[in-house]
Amino acid sequence: MFFVLSIMNSIINTKNMKLSALIFIFGFSISLYSQDKPAYKIFTGEGKKSDYEVLIRVISKADIVFFGELHDNPIAHWLELEITKSLFAAKGKNLILAAEMFETDNQILIDEYFSNLIKEASFESEARLWNNYGTDYKPLLNFAKDNGLKLVASNIPRRYASVVSSGGFEELEKVSSDGLKFIAPLPVDYDPDLKCNKDMLSMSGGPMGHASPNLPKAQAIKDATMANSILKYWQKGQTLIHFNGSYHSDLHQGILWYLNKKNPELKTITISTILQDDINSLNDESKGMADFVILVPSSMTRTYKSAGQ
């Protein structure tokens, strides 16, 4: 009898050991794969590894935060919302949202929608929203609305940017006094030697190609207007987070160039979204691009395809 019990215990122990080994191997495999395929990593502008908690701690002390997104990147859009939630937990009603994706002449529509004067359908039909609004920007707008936060429509109406693209800054002199309310005060400073302006001209086919020298000026009037909108609504003690394409804030140029001309004392923090094949370290050419870099695998899916992609 004792011999039989010993055999049974041995069998049970062997099965338990095998089960434990299988559980360990399974758990290790899950851990290994999850570590091998991160969706993003955070670095400082100098290329040092950072993390989400450090990012939130730093930006919650800033006056103005610029989140430079890639418009078709799902990780950027997800983090925009998550960072907004974390900032709200830290700042409460001292948080303001602002975005390139909404134009200044639509501020009244946002305000009327937030106050429930107009319905969602009316707002969405009139506001000239981006094609990816529903998936990428509506969650931010809804968060602001649901929590009683201000959302600033910061960008110039596209019709005026088109005017500059076609005929230069001089064409804005034809805009009515009512229209000028939606644009940065004229005349607008412009430095053609800024890297962002030179790069814009180069990417568009100039200066040796056929690109119009007015294309960087159209970008500049957007940046100047967004800076003007930020200064119009930000108040001391608040943190304003501005969502824009990374091109508008990379290298602390673009919007920040105009912002610093008006108020150099502002504490600003920039975030840039960058794609790399290997996200374990920041490439040298991306160092200095922003105060924080969100590194995303180049293979990450896109939320939509724009023209030319």
Description of each model-found segment:
Residues 11-21:
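Bacterial N-terminal signal peptides that target proteins for export
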Residues 20-28:
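Sec-dependent N-terminal signal peptides
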Residues 33-309:
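Compositional signal for N-terminal targeting/processing segments
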